[in-house]
Amino acid sequence: MLKLFSAFRKNKIWDFNGGIHPPEMKTQSNGTPLRQVPLAQRFVIPLKQHIGAEGELCVSVGDKVLRGQPLTRGRGKMLPVHAPTSGTVTAIAPHSTAHPSALAELSVIIDADGEDCWIPRDGWDDYRSRSREELIERIHQFGVAGLGGAGFPTGVKLQGGGDKIETLIINAAECEPYITADDRLMQDCAAQVVEGIRILAHILQPREILIGIEDNKPQAISMLRAVLADSHDITLRVIPTKYPSGGAKQLTYILTGKQVPHGGRSSDIGVLMQNVGTAYAVKRAVIDGEPITERVVTLTGEAIARPGNVWARLGTPVRHLLNDAGFCPSADQMVIMGGPLMGFTLPWLDVPVVKITNCLLAPSANELGEPQEEQSCIRCSACADACPADLLPQQLYWFSKGQQHDKATTHNIADCIECGACAWVCPSNIPLVQYFRQEKAEIAAIRQEEKRAAEAKARFEARQARLEREKAARLERHKSAAVQPAAKDKDAIAAALARVKEKQAQATQPIVIKAGERPDNSAIIAAREARKAQARAKQAELQQTNDAATVADPRKTAVEAAIARAKARKLEQQQANAEPEEQVDPRKAAVEAAIARAKARKLEQQQANAEPEQQVDPRKAAVEAAIARAKARKLEQQQANAEPEEQVDPRKAAVEAAIARAKARKLEQQQANAEPEEQVDPRKAAVEAAIARAKARKLEQQQANAEPEEQIDPRKAAVAAAIARVQAKKAAQQKVVNED
């Protein structure tokens, strides 16, 4: 009982939702054996006959080629194409190809020489001793692609399967009306097809191998069973005729009961599917050493006198095949490449045969009926009932017309297999498949644009990151290459630092400055030299950084230099021609001189006779004495050279002169006799003394260079001097009396 249940489970057939049963129309072409077609005079071989990018050209115009010679190189997913016959390459130019849009694609045009010479062929009869990688590479380089209609490179598909394939399915359903290419191939070449299946099984090592074939092909079923009579590793499954049972997802579910997930592939559930024609091409590539240069094409339709299946060379113009079959076109004759449900109408008959061409249908006007006008959707849901992918064609139709791409994507328009079942049952004659094809093309274009935008953004961000890295590296180089202080500057800095440390260590020792001795300014000078060295190093580093960051403009530099020279000349001119705007008032000068002399005498007298109550700061005393002497000399000089406009009171002048002399003597006495109570900084003392000497020299210079503007009256001067002497003597006597 368990064995019976297992056998029933093993041979069980599942059924998918939807599907239709259109007229088969297969008897027109499946009754005659395969035949060869005479060679055409010219062949057009498009470089791209598969899903993916076109290969790289390896021939040039004027080259002689042999049948099977590669015309392109296959790298990665790029599949090569081969010469269908021997001849000469006459052109490499765009040419219309087998596509609904009939767009021109780059093609190699070969003029046949009629000899049909092959390249040297190297078959692998011992393919079982070859590695998996070697077999896949040979299949790929010999140009084998899916011949069921998709055109996916077989080598890439086998490589992607890897070790996760448990079930290998051979699609022999061929469910679309009129097409009998696979049926006739299995009838005439069943042994070769099975041998190709064994090569695929050797590569994939699946757990089971299934051949799915519809029950409307009794002769092909008989031939396969005869070949598989002694085989137990390959199982032939006969399934009911239903369109589109030949779809990859539909046949997978029929044979295994497994459903391919939305947006996924059959390999995701451990299943890999190949077409009958692909298995035959694999056998010829591996065992016979022949690249794919021809395939079986069905020529059918009431407009063809001799329908049947022929071996058509790739690149043969459609017109040549139809004429050989007795094509009798009507006034508005159409030719369909493919079947009536999934095929497309050719715009002209110069289109070449490619790897995915399985049928050329030339129906009469009565065969397909008059074209019906498209009407509005009545929402009958017949399309949803017929859809084998469980989609909602009515909703997808509205989304496609309204260009609502997001909603169309959400409703899984990508899962549409474009079988045409929905359009077949539509009572409003709406060409739903055309809308879906256009919508998928627009979505693909949008995604391609988004991909390019993302790549451009990634390139921009990478460029920004590279610029940031280069900037950081450049700044690091500038920092490391900055000019260091010269050797002598380093020595000066080190010496200054050593002296500073020594001074700090000796800070507790008192510093005594003796009168008349010159202070030691070596530490100050060394520190100043060190600061200058540091400034020079810093300036050099700044200059180098500025030079590295910005290159100076020579014109701007020249202009600035010219402006500087002009300013210098202007200043020299002003200094040479300038005259003092204000004159010194002689009366005020005489008064100030008299006052200064009086203050000096008074200070001298007080200093000579009095004992200081407080200690005097020698630094301040020296500075004040120098300032007083300078002022006295300046006033005397001004008084000698200037003529006062008004008379000066001689008594006041004598008093002021005496006071000035007294102050001066007092300051000198205090400086000579006083001992400082506090320690004096020698550096500050030296600086103050230098300032006082500089001011005194400046005043002497001004007094020596001054020119009197007016003459002084000698009589008045004599009177003033006499009065001053009298007053001075009187003051001295009075002072002596006071002391006694």
UniProtKB/Swiss-Prot annotation:
Top EC class for this record: translocase
Keywords for the protein's UniProt record, in alphabetical order: 4Fe-4S, Cell inner membrane, Cell membrane, Electron transport, Iron, Iron-sulfur, Membrane, Metal-binding, Repeat, Translocase, Transport
EC number annotated for this UniProt entry: 7.-.-.-
Molecular-function annotations in GO: 4 iron, 4 sulfur cluster binding; electron transfer activity; metal ion binding
Residues covered by region (Disordered): 602-714
Cofactor: [4Fe-4S] cluster
Range of residues in the leader sequence: none
Binding site for [4Fe-4S] cluster 2: 387, 416, 419, 422
Start and end residues of each 4Fe-4S ferredoxin-type domain: 369-397, 407-436
Topology within the bilayer: Peripheral membrane protein
Composition bias type Low complexity, residue spans: 605-615
Cofactor note: Binds 2 [4Fe-4S] clusters per subunit.
Subcellular location: Cell inner membrane
Highest taxon, organism lineage: Bacteria
Gene Ontology biological process terms, A to Z: electron transport chain
Major place of residence: membrane
Binding site for [4Fe-4S] cluster 1: 377, 380, 383, 426
One GO cellular component, as annotated: plasma membrane
Function (record text): Part of a membrane-bound complex that couples electron transfer with translocation of ions across the membrane. Required to maintain the reduced state of SoxR.
The family this protein is said to belong to: Belongs to the 4Fe4S bacterial-type ferredoxin family. RnfC subfamily.
Subunit structure: The complex is composed of six subunits: RsxA, RsxB, RsxC, RsxD, RsxE and RsxG.
Protein's name in the database: Ion-translocating oxidoreductase complex subunit C
Taxonomy of the source species: Bacteria, Pseudomonadati, Pseudomonadota, Gammaproteobacteria, Enterobacterales
Designated gene of the protein: rsxC
